[in-house]
From Swiss-Prot:
Protein name: 3,4-dihydroxy-2-butanone 4-phosphate synthase
Transmembrane domains' residue ranges: none
A molecular-function term among this protein's GO annotations: magnesium ion binding
Organism: Haemophilus influenzae (strain 86-028NP)
Entries under SUPFAM superfamilies matching the protein: YrdC/RibB (SSF55821)
Function, as annotated: Catalyzes the conversion of D-ribulose 5-phosphate to formate and 3,4-dihydroxy-2-butanone 4-phosphate.
One cellular-component annotation, GO: cytosol
Amino acid sequence: MNQSILSPFGNTAEERVLNAINAFKHGTGVLVLDDEDRENEGDLIFPAETITSEQMAKLIRYGSGIVCLCITDERCQQLDLPPMVEHNNSVNKTAFTVTIEAAKGVSTGVSAADRVTTIQTAIADNAVPTDLHRPGHVFPLRAANGGVLTRRGHTEASVDLARLAGFKEAGVICEITNDDGTMARTPEIVEFAKKFGYSVLTIEDLVEYRLAHNI
């Protein structure tokens, strides 16, 4: 990736990661790019702990519509969320679990407010499996232990960013799409970020930062 295109968001990996962490601390979303040889996509990511209905609506409006809740393996076990399929043969081994809906406080589960309620239910400290119905309209993703140092995915990046910002290890993500329904690539992601005032970083930035600081 031509790093100069990311210079408006920081001239180094460290700057971009610190800007993203600061944005997370203030409850603002960030855009995370993966490698051009991987998915070559940009995800808009919010801390699960602070996401609002307005932010969820933006994910739904500008994203693919598949809004995912990225959580740790420990949280998946706490909620008794099994994998979506027994044998995961997807190219990038994206670890979807069964989909979920809050058992209380939602109507159809589709609206932005309902999805936020489901997310807040799932990440509550005292959450138990019966707090959730299955299936639903929120797609949990199980993050690999070790985060981006183990798997260079948006799932792990969101959990790592939440942890580095001092939040629960949970993030809400959705891939950004163009108006014609195609996937937004780096140039479109940069323009989207400038339009809405988001920070941008790459997963490799996060890897470099974690290795440099041994965190």
